[in-house]
Amino acid sequence: KLKKLYRGYLSFDDACDALTGRSTGKLLPTEFVLALLKLHIQELKGRTLFIDGLPRETDQVSYSLFFRDLIDYRDDPDMFILIDIPESVIDERIKYRVVCPECKNTRNIKLLITRRIEYDEKQGKYHLLCDSPRCKGGHRMLPKEGDNLGIVPIRSRLDKDEEILRKAFALHGIPKILLRNHVSVAESKKFFDDYEITPEYSFKREKGRIKVIEKPWTIKDDNGIKSVSLLSAPVVVALLKQLADILEI
């Protein structure tokens, strides 16, 4: 079915190879992405679609604008959801990311810890232990290969995302939801409570136990302004408020 739907300049076999062996720095051909989406959408009769990561190239903007016509959902409202996240936030979320080798649950040694932490005497390092109910539990969570480089391997993708965001923001005739992941430290106390701010965690050994130290996580935004990063809940609230306005509900 996928081969019948595919129309592109790259051979079907090469496109499949790009899918199975893709790296974080390279994007799949647009035509192949559309074929994959069409194939999956055929199985989702009459459902609302939320497509994450489209567009990823400037030529995909036009595809996304007319995508509802391609899938015959002509009467459904469409919109762009644009989120502004400082590169420093992305960088640290990648650098401190750890994954359970058993269930693939993801956490962050600095920003999203588990309930169980252990200290390795030989390494002189703290480790998170997986506590997912889907997992047998107790596995030491490990960093992914290349994560120590942060945003370096995906620099070209980030630059492209910035270009696309600016292009999408300039479009007329399509509603846009604008979200911010961060707010300056100076303004944060005026509009947000402490429980809405992303905490930063560190650890200390004290009387044979591991003490968790928590404080607000501060970063520099892309303009060099000292800022805090919001947790997901206040960002989702902002999304729902704007969505209700667009849908007039």
Give the label of every model feature segment.
Residues D69-Y73, L165:
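Substrate-engagement module of ASCE P-loop NTPases
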Residues L54-V61, P77-F80, I85:
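Conserved Switch II/interswitch segment of TRAFAC-class P-loop GTPases
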Residues D131-I249:
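NTP-dependent small-molecule kinase module
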Residues G46, Y73-M79, Y96-R97, H172-I177:
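Short glycine-/polar-rich loops that comprise or flank the Walker A/P-loop
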Residues V89-S156, K160:
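Cys/His-rich short segments
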Residues K1-D69, G224-V228, V235, L239:
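ATP-dependent small-molecule kinase phosphotransfer cores
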Residues T58-S62, S88-I94, I109-K110, E187-K190:
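Switch/connector loops and helix/strand junctions flanking conserved nucleotide-binding motifs
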